[in-house]
Amino acid sequence: MIIDLGNNIKLIRPEGKAMFPYCNSVYIDDEIKTLIDAGSGGNAYAQIPKEEIGLILLSHSHFDHTHGLDYFPRARIMSGMEEQFAFQDENKFYITAGFQRWEELMGSPKEEKMTSQTPLPDDVLVKPGFRRVELGGVFKDHDEIMAGSIRIVALHTPGHSAGHYGFYFPDQKILFSGDLDISPRGPWYGGFDSNYGDVIASVEKLIALKPEVLITSHRKVFYQDIEKLLREYVQIAIDRDEKIMAFLDQPRTLDEIAGQELGFYGLGKTLFNIFWSKVMILKHIEYHIQAGEVEDLGNHRYVRN
């Protein structure tokens, strides 16, 4: 499905739901035909001239945003400078996923693959994992990119991942916030390179833009109450943080914290969601250890100072 936002800016929605392994893409149908993210699937991309796409901007390196790159053989591909390694260094790519800590956090070796829980559709060309991509350049915070006559400003918005970017169309006041996505489950910060504090700061950065239209990677287009939606979204993580800190009034183990109702399991208690929930709890704890507000007692035991 294509949603025309005006001024040659269009949202490409996947044929199915815009959830893993899919994401929304933004298509700029101007002199330089440009795509933001490449995870909408081949069926969705059948509606645009794939051979004419000249530029692809990637919000970050996660699989559901990159698996469709091969549909666009003539495109110059750009990523944020902070995450370019994910397309070039296999070892660093896998470290950011954090699965090397699986046995430590889960108590048993990791045996299951994500694709065993979510079989990939036919229009997803590749499987999750490292794939070397020849980048045609990188962008940094506040870089201005011209897609023909359309101005796009790259916004470094870390937290979901260290190199996560949003993209702002200042002349149209349209914001693409990527995986800061207004999910009813709140932000996701379960990667090795995720950061709870950065999520809060990045959402504030987006609010300060005062956009009139908000596009996200996995939801619909929002035209109203955008500041309210962003604040409610990040408040889910803030409320979770307050629950964790209240529970640390005495020494607690990570498993004890994870046993509390912290609102992680909107997609079910799969092994992957349990693992990611523990990583996110650790992101809260790391944030407060750095602030001197939590003490690490060793063996994944923590207490509030």
Spell out what each predicted region is.
Residues N8, I28, D37, H60, ...:
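Divalent metal-coordination and catalytic microenvironments
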Residues S40, K127-P128, R151-D241:
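Metallo-beta-lactamase
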Residues Y27-D29, I36, N43-E52, H67-R74, ...:
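Alpha-helix C-terminal capping segments
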Residues M1-P49, Y165-L180:
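Conserved beta-strand hairpin/beta-sheet module of binuclear metal-dependent hydrolase folds
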Residues L5-R13, D122-P128, G148-I150:
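Short Pro/Gly-enriched beta-strand edge/turn motifs at strand-loop
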Residues T34-I36, L57, I77, I174-F176, ...:
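Residue-level marker for buried hydrophobic side chains located in beta-strands
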Residues P21, G42-I145:
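Active-site HxH/HxHxD metal-binding segment of metal-dependent hydrolases
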Residues K243-N305:
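C-terminal regulatory/interaction regions
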